[in-house]
Amino acid sequence: PPYADSPNVTANGGTAGGRRHRARRKADKPRQERELMLRCMYHTVPGRVLLKMLSGRRFSALCGRFMDSSLSRPLIRRFVRKNHIDLNEYTATRYRSFNDCFTRRIRAEMRPIPHNPRALIAPCDGRLSAYRISDGLVMPIKQSWYSVSDLLGGDPIAEAYRNGVCLVFRLCVDNYHRYCYIDNGTKGRNVFLPGQLHTVRPIALSRIPVFIRNCREYTVMDTAAFGPVTQIEVGALLVGKILNHDAEARVHRGAEKGMFLYGGSTIVLLLREGAADLPDALFEK
């Protein structure tokens, strides 16, 4: 037909705008389903009961054992296909379990380290949010809100980062889930903070405010280029899915620091004022 060459009309007679709208609706569907599930779990009595069960240590441990076992292997093919993961970028293409696939090791040439020692490298793959640290700063991390002090469990060291920078790296499920040291230096001990689920009224009531604290693990590093830096890994609700390799040790830029198993997916870096020269465009308003 004469209108088929129009940029807004497809050859089968449908409008390109309508086609894009349907594509957006299809892309938004998983997000809408997740939001509906969260509303049900946080704001209904059955959902609250289920949340208590799912956030329990026994259930999380059982899930962890399943993900580590060969019984979870059938999940791998769908996971790889759904998330468009190119296994050729990794050192192995066959895996013993789902967690073995989830923590797959990437080829070194896929993540080259810049030669400039003053270049601040990302500790992991992910989407970055940057914040200037002030007294009123609270950040959304994994369905909860944290101040810097909250993230560190009230550790007084938080005060050292006043007017500094907080970098939050949110890993997506298809990202590489191992992470590295950002610089040469020494690291202190790993401090683990267990997750907590607080409700302010009995679970029998229909709507109950919930306060969640995910499990975290943090360490302070004395780095060559950026001075004292604190790195925080954020895991699942109650049971940690964080595996750090080293206790107190000398560390090297780009060397693997640890990895997330399924359920852990955020890294936070705290830098002191003036430690790194970052562009203003990087920071959220």
Residue ranges and their predicted role:
Residues 2-3, 12-285:
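Contiguous, well-folded functional domains in the mature portion of proteins
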